[in-house]
């Protein structure tokens, strides 16, 4: 079939700036969840960008050839994403096998689901929570998002092809995509249960697809190759204003939109995705200034490495914080060390896995492996290969021999702590109902602070805590912290239950 004329594809450097903001938001959300309460929305930013760029590329290919090369599309995605993912899975599994064997439980299922881009559904099936800081310390929790994106990579090119073949009219395609995003958002609201852990709707492909497909929708409305640089000055100012307002709203959401708010699941995340769509549209327009404003060496560096940064940030935090105790005593020092480790390892991942993975020659790699085993010589190159082989074998041992259980070791330990805390909570509740007379303690006794778990309180605050009469009602999180709370607040009456 004769090729149609196609406008030259554009590289939108400003999107690296948006990627850098997104990945920094996610990292600092995991480091400071009580301060950067909406940093998790960085994932929605990645989704909108991904949906826009992939659909924009598919449209250009269709306009040029009237077909979609599915094999090339999937191979290109695998070469782009798989090497770095394999690296983080292998290295982290080897570390767990050698140094942190309490995390071996279900390792095989985690790795398999991550490699097949089904980790989000695996975590849902096993009842794992993204928001439970006490119970879920897996270094692979964040890989749920790759599952959603990977499933979209598999599904969307097929849907795109069918739409272009049978629907054809742009107007009807836009209507279909918009309806699909609304259905996904409605699923999120329908499946969300107020007061319960929102991980099911947070992880689900069905409830998160709207961010990706809003990006797809934008590519039909706002194709990058059809946008003109020479636009009226008034239009340029208007675009810049929209971009500024969208970026401001996104920044406020990053700081304040707590994932525990009902609003997030009753349309809030959908609205934020719309805000991101506006921001991506303005950055993509060559007539606006935001592409230039978000293009600088720092943003370019972070944006190009955002995938590796996202992959490595959680394993580094989990492994580091498991080995280093009392981090709160020198919080900023330990945070700096974690950031240095994250950026250092991500740089290695970017250079050795992402960059080289795109150009890897599997046949040459196979022949090199054969020659090394037949004629091993002690050189720096062979030592590197031996070290790599040791890491891979360590990972395989852990993956093959890991236990498969419906609950993880951390969940089992947590259930035991919950049982103990339940007893303490009942004692506290009964004590509060029957021993009101004990409030008449002497001033000397009330001034003696009991030995409490270090929580960065001053002596004055500890003294005040000894005298406060507090009633606390909560769920399993409060139940798990009962012992520590009663050390600080001995007169506290705690009424906590699992699943409240």
Show the residue positions of the predicted features.
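Membrane-interface helix/loop caps of multi-pass membrane proteins
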Residues: 1-364
